[in-house]
């Protein structure tokens, strides 16, 4: 869950007002015994694990979680599980010193596991710090555990992360137990890293470039899905976590520089300005709501094709507009957004990694209906019109090559190569 800061984010609080939210740590905090001792001395909580003798159900749950932890990417889990078993066995004697030692040993193991589990996804662009995994300090982890009505259920809930993560991890672990090969596939760990930032609860949009599918989620359940067209191998759709606050009807399309250079300018040279005008293009002086339009006759199109002249070209709303009738923007540094398209034939293709990074959606009206709560009808007629959503909706663009099909784990082709190394983005698209 996003907590209080996340709730404020979804109600549309400006990004500037979010700056006070603390950034989560970006690397695993190596917890020492001193950290745990300091926690117990500072907060003086009731025992978490040994409140009325050893909490056998919680200890068994913790041991099982730690034994499975290599499949979360935490290789130290089995070693910590053995330490927990030994400490709990000694505490069952009722010896006060053994009980105190067990309490600290179990807390140390749990904190180390949670801190490893709640790392930000490598290579993901977080539009707001609050979208990163939260609650990784010793005090946050242990106070939350101490306050849980059922410690056993709390441990399971934290370890399961979210429904997508849980299904992938548990399927892989069950298959490993069946075969006896307990070494997790690096591809699995890469995929788990890419989905660990998804929320366990609430409403969000998931765009998966691995399968080129968009899924709508509510409290971990899939409500709807549709095909999308995502980035090519050369121009992949980035990993992004953001929040969508509005949609745009009848959007202008701003042509990327490389398409101006490779497509628009050469076509003007060979076909003349009639090509330019028939496609609804304008050369403008700036990216703004009211730019000045520049006469295309004054442009050196050969220089534009050569890349020595950089033009700002937009396409007016209409049937030829590359954005279709709806655009779904959200804050991010890569200028990525979702949008409609007039070309629906490509959705029939099996391989839909065909875009320049942005995401074309199969049914923009259906997505708009889910976001708005009613049929998307522009209040501004055919003019470009922005409509605010009643509440911000989190959106996650990720890349999932591990799939569970008929109860078995399978892998899709790694077209981006991100199963081997996290993404490094180009400075421009």
What are these regions (language model features)?
Residues 1-17:
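Gram-negative bacterial Sec-dependent N-terminal signal peptides
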Residues 18-30, 108-112, 116, 131, ...:
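Well-ordered beta-sheet/strand-loop patches within structured domains
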Residues 18-128:
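Cationic-aromatic interfacial patches
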